[in-house]
Amino acid sequence: QAVIVDKEISKEFEKLMKEADCYFLNKEETEKLEKSMFENEKLKSEIAGQSPYNIAKAAGIEIPEKTKVIVVPQTGIGPGHPFSKEKLSPVLAYYIVPNSDKGIETAEKLIEFGGLGHSAVIHSEDEETINKFSNRVKVGRIIVNSPSTHGAIGDIYNTNMPSLTLGCGTFGGNSTTANVSSVNLINIKRVAKRRVN
């Protein structure tokens, strides 16, 4: 889970996130959280499903109990940067980019490092940027101008099949990019009789 924001709107974004009870870590807090959340760059199993307050407390960081998301400013992606992977928790890596092209490039790198085939979200009013993003990012779902989690699982904000099991296709080593439902679990027998086409 990461958010990539154009520098031009980053201050406004940060203000809105803080108003929504998100907590931005400083450098020292980021180092503490990294040591607490990861072991050999792998997410510790006890982190998944924990509240932001409990995650921060375990790292020795004081944050308001009402915090909804911990935001971790980042610049790097890949080995040596564990926050650039999936975190299964209310912890967001935060990247500031100079323009939409760099934003798309950053999204591609994040997906390549950990998330091929899953889901990506773009908030933009520029159709050209949306199309570029959609064509380049290797995921099974592109969610446009909608909340990411509820957009990806379908039905509430779009016509995607409602599901909590999201296929990642061949990008992610799965057989489908669909939101998996009962349709994917039914065996259908096809009887084919000879005919001249």
Identify the role of each PLM range.
Residues 2-8, 169-171:
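Short beta-strand and adjoining strand-loop segment in the mid-core
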Residues 24-65, 72, 121-197:
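C-terminal segments
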Residues 1-5, 91-94, 120-122:
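Short cationic amphipathic helices and targeting signals
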Residues 8-11, 15-116:
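NAD(P)-dependent aldehyde/semialdehyde dehydrogenase
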